[in-house]
């Protein structure tokens, strides 16, 4: 047993080259153009740079957003106990919950991540269970006491130093095990902060110093990010954190004052001091239009990142740069477990990458070591595969190939410093921009022959700030064709990735716009053909046979059908006809067919036949246009060759592809619905359906995955097995999901369940392979609840409180304004509620007037003040009464529930009640006194 005692990062200059950009100078032919400005039309003119925004990233934030990829490593007792949160270890010894009997393999994990393009590794040195994966002198709840002979944090640090991998430290503030957590007296009973015997804030700070001040930890002693997870289990709120003290300690050892550091250590979960923010979910995805700015209030130590389930969207006009960080998992859980060790598919990881990095955020992917201290080979291989797909996708920038011309609608001062060619020079510090007074500009990339691509990358010069609030990407199939919109939206930021079905074009145009007074600036632009693994997947579930409508071997047409292409269609292909009796046939092998196409306000009906037998009339009319959707689904068919025939009846019919179940009658399983709603402390019953055949037995698991809902909101270990026996087409699953009671004010949260681990291998998991579950917050803060609190708070009276009124009044005024603002966001409403509730709790009830807290006479015209009698500075009982003493009494009829009872004047003396007061002005004051008397006179 050890005796308890109480008592960095590398600064990098701006302009780091993007990880996977092509190396070497751009090979761009800057030929003459009919319109626009090319490099050849620019010269050195000494034009000043445009002004930077007030809010820009510091060097560490800039590097992180350019690095793009970081990894998380969750490892600890939970790894050995098949759980996510160590809430129930109780008094078990460290050796009972942590059983690593061989050396931790840090080298393989770090090397694999580095080779796959990851630039940072964040380590859970201490999770919520309080167990430390290093031998800490401040606790005996660590690896040393568990019998592990090494120092896992030091071993990972050594590997990161070898491979030059940035490091982040995860040190959970919430500590379930530590005795000093919360407020307890000498006997261990709950008490007030003032009477707390042990100080958890000191304990946590000591551990920060122990790690951050020791050169054996970190990448050569440096940490670039400290993660203070905001998770707090229900009932764990009786501990206020001394964040300011902790922040000072972090920067003392790892901040910009340390030699070699150009910026402070980044902080996650640090309230107003946050420099890396949670994206709002644990799915690893960001909002489509994400801003890298939040609004912080240092006086109140609050942050508002425009949170609206399941995203923190940021603000265009935020006052602080906060890197949007998307934390997600390569498996279903954060910690490894025998039932949650299957890695996500490359398609799932691709979606995560494009929806995080491609939405102006960083991707933080958790890679969990197993109970042998190594990373499973399938997980390592998936990391390698992911890294290879990133490299393969972005290796060749078609906008840099020989024979390319890049034109700009405007170039700032026609200066070579801001020429269009800067966007393909692989240098983040250079950029293209426009003259002052312009708030929109475009770049047009032209090729001498058509190029096939499916990814367009746009990077804003964020060293000057994030300002672009509109973008559009267009293409021309040929020089004389019309412009077709590939994608449009709002934000660009560090990177905007537009991924579509493959298209061929001779020109691509990128148009960006900003607010008044600001010019657009782009540092890099790329046009790419995605690797096979990173291609935009069609709507077909994995395992189905798919046929595009341009496959003229399987699809046959008569009369007038009109082929067209576009990124909005499955595989970029569509064929339509509005000619009555126009016919198509599709021949396929399988047991069920889905015809995919377009629904539109201008589309109509068609008759469908299977094997020359009429099946039904389909109606493809819809109020809004959708592409890539199911327009026909057959019944289950006998395994074999079949022919589908479609005959146009009225208006237009658009067809894109056919999907077929063709696995010998084993079939496809899926959840009945794609969305469910649950209450807290609830269980969910779902139906799993089987189509396309019922031959043999199919088993699968229903696996829960965190989203904006985290482990305290639902049972992460609940993963029931689904079994559909031979001939069975439907099964009901009880307890498919189980929610918990979370007494924290969280708002509605969401997680998902998905069908995984199917058996046999040729079984198909269908369109509804996963479902989103919304948990309704029993304690949710909404506008009505805020309004109720405002009304209740408005009834409080200033004269009843000696401290905290000014803060309370300010919070009340702000809450009232927010409640009346119809455009107030969910986050703004929540913050206003919490601020008012906290200010209300902080009010100190007045006991009496004193020399330092005097009653103030109202001297301004039209004002008044109430003096409660029971707030007497002194009460002198001079009459010697035994029954009717002059003292404070309590009755319901009295204002504030109290009054001065029995003031008497007798031969022996006169009772006196005195008040400390202050009269700022000399004059006559009018007093109305309320009293009662026991004397009839």
Where are these regions (language model features)?
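Edge beta-strands of jelly-roll/beta-sandwich modules across compartments, strongly enriched
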Residues: 517-530, 651-661, 698-700, 749-751
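Mature catalytic domains of secreted/periplasmic carbohydrate-active enzymes
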Residues: 36-427, 431-437, 444, 457-459, ...
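Aromatic, loop-rich ligand-recognition surfaces of beta-strand-rich domains
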Residues: 393, 425-536, 583-587, 596, ...
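Beta-rich interaction/scaffold domains
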Residues: 779-858
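Glycan-recognition surfaces in beta-rich domains, encompassing non-catalytic CBMs
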Residues: 532-665, 858-914, 920, 933
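Sec-dependent signal peptide cleavage junction
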Residues: 19-35
């Amino acid at each position: 047993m050890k005796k308890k005692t109480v008592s960095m990062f590398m600064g990098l200059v701006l302009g780091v080259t993007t990880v996977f950009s092509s190396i070497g100078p751009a090979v761009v032919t800057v030929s003459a153009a009919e319109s626009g400005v090319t490099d050849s039309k620019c010269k050195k003119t000494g034009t000043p740079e445009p002004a930077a925004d007030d809010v820009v990233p510091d060097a560490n934030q800039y590097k992180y957003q350019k690095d793009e990829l970081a990894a998380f490593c969750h490892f600890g007792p939970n790894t050995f106990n098949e759980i996510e949160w160590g809430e129930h270890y109780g008094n078990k010894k460290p050796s009972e919950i942590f059983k690593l009997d061989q050396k931790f393999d840090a080298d393989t994990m770090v090397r694999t991540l580095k080779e796959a393009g990851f630039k940072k590794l964040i380590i859970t040195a201490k999770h919520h269970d309080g167990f430390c994966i290093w031998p800490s002198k401040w606790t005996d709840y660590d690896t040393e006491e568990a019998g592990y002979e090494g120092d896992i944090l030091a071993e990972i640090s050594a590997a990161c130093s070898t491979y030059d991998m940035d490091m982040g430290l995860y040190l959970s503030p919430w500590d379930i095990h530590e005795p000093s957590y919360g407020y307890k007296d000498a006997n261990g009973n709950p008490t007030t902060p003032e009477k707390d015997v042990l100080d958890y804030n000191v304990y946590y700070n000591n551990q920060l110093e122990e790690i951050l001040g020791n050169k054996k930890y970190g990448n050569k002693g440096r940490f670039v990010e400290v993660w203070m997870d905001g998770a707090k289990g229900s009932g764990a709120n009786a501990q206020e954190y001394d964040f300011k003290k902790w922040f000072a300690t972090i920067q003392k050892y790892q901040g910009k004052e340390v030699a070699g550091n150009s910026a402070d250590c980044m902080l996650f979960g640090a309230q107003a001091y946050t420099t890396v923010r949670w994206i709002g979910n644990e799915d690893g995805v960001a909002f489509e239009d994400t801003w890298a700015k939040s609004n912080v209030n240092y006086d109140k130590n609050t942050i508002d990142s425009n949170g609206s389930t399941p995203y923190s969207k940021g603000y265009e006009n935020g006052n602080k740069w906060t890197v949007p960080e998307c934390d997600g998992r390569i498996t279903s859980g954060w910690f490894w477990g025998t039932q949650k060790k299957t890695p996500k598919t490359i398609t799932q990881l691709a979606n995560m990458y494009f929806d995080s990095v491609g939405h102006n955020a960083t991707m933080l992917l958790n890679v969990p070591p197993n109970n042998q201290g190594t990373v499973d080979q399938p997980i390592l291989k998936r990391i390698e595969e992911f890294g290879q797909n990133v490299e393969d996708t972005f290796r060749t920038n078609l906008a840099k190939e020989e024979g390319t011309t890049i034109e700009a609608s405007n170039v700032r001062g026609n200066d070579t410093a801001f020429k269009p060619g800067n966007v393909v020079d692989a240098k983040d510090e250079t950029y293209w921009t426009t003259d002052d007074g312009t708030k929109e500009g475009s770049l047009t990339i032209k090729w001498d022959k058509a190029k096939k691509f499916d990814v367009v990358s746009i990077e804003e010069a964020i060293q000057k700030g994030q300002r672009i609030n509109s973008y559009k990407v267009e293409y021309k199939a040929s020089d004389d064709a019309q412009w077709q919109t590939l994608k449009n939206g709002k934000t660009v930021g560090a990177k905007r990735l537009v991924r579509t079905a493959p298209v061929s074009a001779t020109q691509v145009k990128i148009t960006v716009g900003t607010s008044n007074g600001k010019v657009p600036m782009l540092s890099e632009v790329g046009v790419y053909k995605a690797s096979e693994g990173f291609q935009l997947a069609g709507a077909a579930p994995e395992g189905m046979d798919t046929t595009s409508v341009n496959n003229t071997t399987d699809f046959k047409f008569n009369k007038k059908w009109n082929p067209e292409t576009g990124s909005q269609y499955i595989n970029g292909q569509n064929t339509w006809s509005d000619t009555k009796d126009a016919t198509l046939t599709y021949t396929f092998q399988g047991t069920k067919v889905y015809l995919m196409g377009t629904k539109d306000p201008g589309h109509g009906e068609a008759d469908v036949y299977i094997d020359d037998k009429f099946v039904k009339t389909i109606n493809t009319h819809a109020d809004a246009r959708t592409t890539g959707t199911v327009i026909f689904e057959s019944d289950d068919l006998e395994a074999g060759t079949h022919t589908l025939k479609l005959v146009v009846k009225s208006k237009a019919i658009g067809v894109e592809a056919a999907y077929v179940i063709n696995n010998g009658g084993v079939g496809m399983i899926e959840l009945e619905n794609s969305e469910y709603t649950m209450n807290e402390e609830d269980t969910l019953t779902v139906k799993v359906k089987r189509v396309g055949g019922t031959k043999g037995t199919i088993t699968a698991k229903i696996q829960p995955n965190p989203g904006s809902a985290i482990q305290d909101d639902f049972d992460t270990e609940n993963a029931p097995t689904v079994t559909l026996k031979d001939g069975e087409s439907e099964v009901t699953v009880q307890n498919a999901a189980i929610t918990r009671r979370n007494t924290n004010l969280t708002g509605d949260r969401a997680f998902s369940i998905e069908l995984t681990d199917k058996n046999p291998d040729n079984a198909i998991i269908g369109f509804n392979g996963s479902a989103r579950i919304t948990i309704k917050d029993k304690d949710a803060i909404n506008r009505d609840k805020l309004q109720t609190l405002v009304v209740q708070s408005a009834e409080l009276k200033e004269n009843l409180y000696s401290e905290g009124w000014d803060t309370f009044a300010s919070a009340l005024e702000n809450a009232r304004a927010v409640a009346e603002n119809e455009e107030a966001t969910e986050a703004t409403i929540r913050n206003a509620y919490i601020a008012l509730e906290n200010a209300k709790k902080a009010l100190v009830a007045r006991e009496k007037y004193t020399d330092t807290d005097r009653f103030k006479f109202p001297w301004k015209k039209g004002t008044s003040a109430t003096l409660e009698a029971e707030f007497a500075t002194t009460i002198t009982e001079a009459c010697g009464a035994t029954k009717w003493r002059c003292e404070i009494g309590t009755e319901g009829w009295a204002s504030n529930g109290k009054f001065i009872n029995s003031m008497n004047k007798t031969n022996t003396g006169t009772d006196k009640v005195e008040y400390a007061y202050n009269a700022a002005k000399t004059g006559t004051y009018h007093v109305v006194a309320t009293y009662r008397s026991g004397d009839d006179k």
